[in-house]
Curated annotation (Swiss-Prot):
Keyword DNA-binding: no
Cofactor: binding details: Binds 2 divalent ions per subunit. Binds 1 potassium ion per subunit.
Record key words, sorted: ATP-binding, Cytoplasm, Magnesium, Metal-binding, Nucleotide-binding, One-carbon metabolism, Potassium, Transferase
GO molecular function list: ATP binding; magnesium ion binding; methionine adenosyltransferase activity
Quaternary assembly: Homotetramer; dimer of dimers.
Species of the source: Treponema denticola (strain ATCC 35405 / DSM 14222 / CIP 103919 / JCM 8153 / KCTC 15104)
Residues reported in the UniProt entry to bind ATP: H17, D170, S171, K172, R237, F238, D246, R252, K253, A269, K273
Family matches, as PROSITE patterns: ADOMET_SYNTHASE_1, ADOMET_SYNTHASE_2
UniProt protein name: S-adenosylmethionine synthase
Length: 389
């Protein structure tokens, strides 16, 4: 890309957004299964509406999972403790509609399907997954999505600590960044909509959210300007929220979960899925690969696509795109990737140590750009450089 002026916008939603409530419940169920039975097969979906949480899907596990307790504890942890907030963890109905995994799927995953793949763990489904990394932030993530997550994470902290006592759980933000080529040069626009108690005045709400939430988070980036535009609760009121205001469903925030629209998405959601589902595990591996490519200074931007067929124990395709920023040809990077990384479903699980109860923490504020997760390590840079030579 030339050094043209351009703008890119990404949004995030808070842990109290109805869809994120559902993601967190689904991943908490997954964690409960993996904690006692790492071989659990889980595809857990959650639906939340007025006074109701419904948990369904396919689970095969050797442990007992208390769906009622998990759903209520997650809602309480988020802050849904009063019907006025959009949901009450104590009085809401919780329905359990879970059943076991299809044996037709299971035989492909367990290595008991076609003779040519006997004994090898196959992919849990077909599909393509993308990973992305760039040098816009220290986390090697796109700036708009990282900034959006950071604002909402800080707002939730102030809400839970009652520093801003009139905030309620539901919120979302959207940030537009001005670029010169691929370089962020200014935060152009910040949109923040936050649920609140009915008695707070709009002027106080707007001033507080700008000066006590947005500026403390985004100020240190050096990208806020005097003419940065702020749109705070643009309708003027956001009292009704949570599942009462909008129905929630697992897997409806896949762009929030990944790169904010910068970098492609294969379409598969993450939450509620055990690591045999390549929708999740291969997307994590693709991020791991792309981040190591960028950290190794082989490119300033990198997108990796992996593709799988159900029951097949290896990727059917691998693709690399450096958007013209590569220091070496893409075919060389692709060849090095195939040498350095084990992209088989079993290899991904082993490399990233994915049969652990780590998933509930991924289910709000993005799955990427967070150093606590194994797919964010940059421990393959030297191996990649060596493989390039």
């Amino acid at each position: 890309m030339k050094n043209d002026i351009n703008y890119f916008t990404s949004e995030s939603v808070s842990e109290g957004h109805p869809d994120k409530l559902c993601d967190q419940i689904s991943d908490a169920v997954l964690d409960a299964c993996l904690r006692d039975d790492p071989e659990s097969h889980v595809a857990c979906e959650t639906f939340a509406s007025t006074a109701l949480v419904l948990v369904g899907g396919e689970i095969t596990t050797n442990t007992y999972v208390d769906i009622q307790e998990i759903a209520r504890s997650i809602a309480e942890e988020i802050g849904y403790t009063n019907t006025d907030f959009g949901l009450d963890c104590h009085s809401m109905a919780v329905m359990n509609m879970i059943h076991s995994q299809s044996p037709d799927i299971s035989q492909g995953v367990d290595g008991t399907g076609l003779d040519e793949y006997k004994g090898q763990q196959g992919a849990g489904d077909q599909g393509m997954m993308f990973g992305f990394a760039c040098k816009e932030t220290p986390e090697l993530m796109p700036a708009p999505i990282m900034f959006s997550h950071s604002v909402l994470r800080y707002a939730a902290k102030l809400r839970k600590e009652k520093v801003i006592p009139w905030l309620r759980p539901d919120s979302k933000t959207q940030i537009t960044v001005k670029y010169e080529g691929f370089k962020p040069i200014k935060i152009d626009t910040v949109v923040l909509s936050h649920q609140h108690y009915p008695d707070v005045q709009y002027d106080e709400l707007k001033d507080t959210l700008i000066n006590r939430v947005i500026k403390p988070v985004l100020g240190p980036t050096g990208l806020l300007a005097d003419d940065t535009k702020y749109f705070i609760n643009p309708t003027g009121r956001f009292v009704i929220g949570g599942p009462f205001g909008d129905t929630g469903l697992t897997g409806r925030k896949i762009i929030v979960d990944t790169y904010g629209g910068m970098g492609r998405h294969g379409g598969g959601a993450f939450s509620g899925k055990d690591p045999s589902k390549v929708d999740r595990s291969a997307a994590y591996m693709a991020r791991y690969i792309a981040k190591n490519v960028v950290a190794a200074d082989l490119a300033r931007r990198c997108e990796v696509q992996l593709a799988y067929a159900i029951g097949v124990p290896f990727p059917v395709a691998v693709r690399v795109d450096t958007f013209g920023t590569g220091e070496v040809p893409e075919e060389k990077i692709e060849k090095a990737i195939k040498e350095v990384f084990d992209m088989s479903p079993a290899g991904i699980i082993k490399t990233l140590d994915l049969k652990r109860p780590i998933y509930k923490e991924t289910a709000a504020y993005g799955h990427f750009g967070r150093p606590e997760f194994s797919w964010e390590k940059t421990d393959k840079t030297e191996a990649l450089k060596k493989a390039i030579k």
